[in-house]
């Protein structure tokens, strides 16, 4: 576990940087408006529910990813989804603005960006952990302790299982990626062996 924090961070790709900047702008605008209207807790809860919905509903992911759907059709479809979730006018307007600005495909990253922005404002750091197998409670506690030692005091861990990693894990905090997966180790070994041949 200790190597997860001591590995060299890798920079985010230009696409991630663009999306992160976009997400941050949208997140800041929604946060400030929700705070001003004294609806922050409600909006945080609704955006978290939308994030779970985007992650769990394959038909919604297909709608979002489709390049062939007209913005008006997408807006109507998303309005139905939002109505079924009972979200506030503030969140409806936020999603509607994103769609009107041709950001339908970016909705999951905008929702995730809002969660990151809220966590930062509250002094909590989000760590995205991908592992080949689900983490045990002991591993989770060790990882949290190692992250605290590395200067990430209050950490919220978001876990995903990615069998393609083969073993080990990756930890992404902001734009830093700590990769101790067996997959990346094998790729580095393959690269070194090609250079020696």
UniProtKB/Swiss-Prot annotation:
HAMAP family: ATP_synth_delta_bact
Subunit annotation: F-type ATPases have 2 components, F(1) - the catalytic core - and F(0) - the membrane proton channel. F(1) has five subunits: alpha(3), beta(3), gamma(1), delta(1), epsilon(1). F(0) has three main subunits: a(1), b(2) and c(10-14). The alpha and beta chains form an alternating ring which encloses part of the gamma chain. F(1) is attached to F(0) by a central stalk formed by the gamma and epsilon chains, while a peripheral stalk is formed by the delta and b chains.
InterPro entries cross-referenced by the UniProt entry: ATP_synth_OSCP/delta_N_sf (IPR026015), ATPase_OSCP/d_CS (IPR020781), ATPase_OSCP/dsu (IPR000711)
Molecular function terms from GO: proton-transporting ATP synthase activity, rotational mechanism
Encoding gene (name): atpH
Gene3D superfamilies with a match to the protein in the record: N-terminal domain of the delta subunit of the F1F0-ATP synthase (1.10.520.20)
Function field: F(1)F(0) ATP synthase produces ATP from ADP in the presence of a proton or sodium gradient. F-type ATPases consist of two structural domains, F(1) containing the extramembraneous catalytic core and F(0) containing the membrane proton channel, linked together by a central stalk and a peripheral stalk. During catalysis, ATP synthesis in the catalytic domain of F(1) is coupled via a rotary mechanism of the central stalk subunits to proton translocation.
UniProt biased composition (Low complexity): 1-16
Region named Disordered: 1-20
Stated name of the protein: ATP synthase subunit delta
